[in-house]
Swiss-Prot record:
Protein encoded by which gene: adk
Location of region: NMP: 30-59
Single GO MF annotation: adenylate kinase activity
Name this protein carries in UniProt: Adenylate kinase
Record-linked InterPro entries: Adenyl_kin_sub, Adenylat/UMP-CMP_kin, Adenylat_kinase_CS, Adenylate_kinase_lid-dom, Guanylate_kin-like_dom, P-loop_NTPase
Top-level taxonomy: Archaea, Methanobacteriati, Methanobacteriota, Stenosarchaea group, Methanomicrobia
Length: 215
């Protein structure tokens, strides 16, 4: 069962990916994570990527796709995988399709979590963090005492990129980047869009109902 997971910031994509990993026993593959792992381990492609990263440049698609191909060939991807954060552009989607054909692991389904902007802005701009790693939400999960962490007693704060204006900018970028991919996979007949406004467990049940066809 080979899956691509799309969803804007705040849609709960990370939460659902983790639940899918636990339930199906297939790995979540985040391009950021495997890129950092290759750099850390000093692989040939990792060193090539590092040369660009050190200059503050984007890692070229051909380097990134090589790293992804190697990861998808590992034993834990035998029964499937969840691609998270890739592809980001139509050329990347074409390159991905080419390597998946080569290793005979085509994508079964592209899952797209859809949540209205106003809900996402509310979810993200209400987030509060603590330096100890605890997280809260002004409405759904506030600390017991205003601005004080329940766990360590430290001051909770809002991240600079979690303000309503910053969140809307991130959503605009996401839509501009992702819409062509939504159209790309819709044309291929493998896109399924889900309502991400429901409760976490309800969304997960919806996901499982869709994936039952491929398990």
């Amino acid at each position: 069962m080979n899956i691509i997971l799309f969803g804007p910031p705040g849609a709960g994509k990370g939460t659902q990916a983790k639940k899918l990993v636990d339930f199906y026993g297939i790995p979540q593959i985040s391009t950021g994570d495997i890129l950092r792992a290759n750099v850390r381990e000093g692989t040939e492609l990792g060193l090539a990527a590092k040369a660009y990263m050190d200059k503050g440049e984007l890692v070229p698609d051909q380097v990134l796709i090589g790293i992804i191909k190697n990861r998808l060939n590992e034993a834990d991807c035998e029964k499937g995988f969840i691609l998270d954060g890739y592809p980001r552009t139509v050329p990347q989607a074409d390159a991905l399709e080419a390597i998946l054909d080569e290793i005979e692991k085509p994508i079964d389904v592209v899952l797209n979590l859809e949540v209205p902007d106003e809900v996402l802005v509310g979810r993200i701009s209400g987030r509060l963090m603590c330096k100890c790693g605890a997280s809260y939400h002004i409405i759904s999960n506030p600390p017991k005492k205003d601005n004080v962490c329940d766990i360590c007693g430290g001051e909770v704060f809002q991240r600079a990129d979690d303000t309503a204006e910053a969140v809307q900018n991130r959503l605009d970028v996401y839509k501009k980047q992702t819409q062509p991919l939504i159209n790309y996979y819709k044309e291929k007949g493998i896109l399924v869009t889900l309502d991400g406004t429901k409760e976490i467990d309800v969304v997960f049940e919806d996901l499982k109902a869709i994936l039952a066809k491929f398990a």
